[in-house]
């Protein structure tokens, strides 16, 4: 089972994914991962932050990172029978660089198709939250250049996620709920036995 947790910055992806992986790990092998930067210890993330004002460079770096991530980490984990819980995947690039920054969405889709090599998640859980609430959560957190884009940017990204969700069959989760409740609902959806 390949599970992805998506949502705008400040929605609680990392907290939910960590708790989810811990719960799954009680019953079966699980691999908890994230994008970007899990493959090369943040090399791409550093390059991305240096080029944050160029959506094409950012999208290209994300998809290069994703291609390595899929090939070297996600597919091998799935082949071993592990469940994979991933924070962000292909749709993050579409939402952030396509809807948020205005890069051509078809170009991003083509890049993602190559990067993921046909591997789509079994379930995508979208942690939905109003952008102003997400920004309030990020107040005390050190923000990177993408997280510091502001309210209007996050509104565009959220609108993008909502449009993507209609075609991809996301399972909506109210990100204002306690993380433990969200995880319980996700576990019900994936029917962990």
Swiss-Prot record:
SUPFAM superfamilies: P-loop containing nucleoside triphosphate hydrolases (SSF52540)
GO cellular component: cytosol
GO molecular function, one term: dTMP kinase activity
EC number(s) per entry: 2.7.4.9
Superkingdom of the source species: Bacteria
Residue numbers binding ATP: 7-14
Keywords: ATP-binding, Kinase, Nucleotide biosynthesis, Nucleotide-binding, Transferase
Keyword Nucleotide-binding: yes
Cystine residue pairs: none
Keyword Protein transport part of the UniProt annotation: no
Reaction it catalyzes: dTMP + ATP = dTDP + ADP
Top EC group: transferase
GO biological process: dTDP biosynthetic process; dTTP biosynthetic process; dUDP biosynthetic process
UniProt-listed InterPro entries: P-loop_NTPase, Thymidylate_kin-like_dom, Thymidylate_kin_CS, Thymidylate_kinase
Protein family membership: Belongs to the thymidylate kinase family.
Role: Phosphorylation of dTMP to form dTDP in both de novo and salvage pathways of dTTP synthesis.
HAMAP family: Thymidylate_kinase (MF_00165)
Full protein name: Thymidylate kinase
Native source species: Coprothermobacter proteolyticus (strain ATCC 35245 / DSM 5265 / OCM 4 / BT)
């Amino acid at each position: 089972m390949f599970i992805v947790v998506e949502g705008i910055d400040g929605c609680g992806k990392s907290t939910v994914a960590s708790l989810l992986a811990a719960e799954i790990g009680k019953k079966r092998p699980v691999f908890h991962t994230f994008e970007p930067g899990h493959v090369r210890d943040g090399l791409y993330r550093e390059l991305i932050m240096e080029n944050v004002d160029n959506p094409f460079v950012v999208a290209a770096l994300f998809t290069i990172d994703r291609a390595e991530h899929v090939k070297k980490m996600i597919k091998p984990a799935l082949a071993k029978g592990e469940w994979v819980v991933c924070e962000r995947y292909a749709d993050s690039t579409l939402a952030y660089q396509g809807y948020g920054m205005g890069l051509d969405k078809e170009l991003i889709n083509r890049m993602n198709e190559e990067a993921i090599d046909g591997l789509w998640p079994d379930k995508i859980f979208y942690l939905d939250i109003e952008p102003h609430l997400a920004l309030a959560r990020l107040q005390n957190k050190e923000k990177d250049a993408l997280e510091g884009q502001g309210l209007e940017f996050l509104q565009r990204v959220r609108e993008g996620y909502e449009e993507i969700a209609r075609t991809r069959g996301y399972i909506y989760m109210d990100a204002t709920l306690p993380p433990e409740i969200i995880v319980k609902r996700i576990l019900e959806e994936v029917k962990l036995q």
